From Swiss-Prot:
Protein known as: Developmental pluripotency-associated protein 3
The keyword Cytoplasm is assigned to this record: yes
InterPro entries per record: Dppa3
Highest taxon, organism lineage: Eukaryota
Entry text on domains: Mediates binding to H3K9me2 via N-terminal region, while ability to exclude TET3 from the maternal pronucleus requires the C-terminal part.
A molecular-function term among this protein's GO annotations: methylated histone binding
One Gene Ontology term from the biological process aspect of the record: epigenetic programing of female pronucleus
Length: 163
């Protein structure tokens, strides 16, 4: 399959001319870079130095689509501000779901909330010893944390207040 069949505007002559134009532009660019390198020691602006300008060529090659020459726009880049905004939205959403008692929820949301509540209760539940003495002979009121704190640390608190 011939390349001229793909795009009839491209011919052998147009390819040769575009290659010649590119080589001329490359020669001018190398001359410009050499001149800049030699004038690098003189860092002051000198209006007498005349730099050759690059010739203007059409930026769009024949057969190139206009959408191909435009740079892609960057999307989805995470910055500190966007990450903070995202976390704040998630926090607000979670607070709204947790404390919005008056708003009727769907069954799935209710079940999810009940599961979260039971998980929280299971984490908060106090330690219970599984030995036979604690299971059968201890008073259940002794398991109360406030009573334990008051009986264990009350003398220590009184001693620290006296000194």
């Amino acid at each position: 399959m011939d390349s001229s069949e793909d795009n009839p505007t491209w011919t052998l002559e147009s390819l040769k001319t575009s290659i010649d134009d590119a080589s001329q532009a490359m020669q001018v660019a190398t001359q410009l870079s050499e001149m800049l390198a030699t004038n690098l020691s003189n860092l002051t602006l000198n209006p007498s130095i005349k730099l050759p300008y690059l010739p203007e060529y059409p930026s769009q090659l024949t057969g190139q689509l206009p959408s191909e020459k435009t740079p892609h726009r960057r999307r989805g880049v995470r910055t500190v501000l966007s990450e903070r905004r995202y976390r704040m939205q998630k926090l607000i959403e979670s607070l709204r779901l947790r404390y919005a008692k008056g708003i009727p929820r769907s069954d799935s949301q209710r079940q999810l909330q009940q599961q979260e509540d039971t998980e929280i209760r299971s984490r908060v539940r106090r330690f219970q010893c599984t030995c036979s003495y604690c299971q059968f002979k201890r008073n259940p009121s002794d398991d109360n944390y406030e009573n334990y704190y008051n009986t264990t640390y009350s003398n220590y608190a009184m001693e620290s207040n006296e000194s």
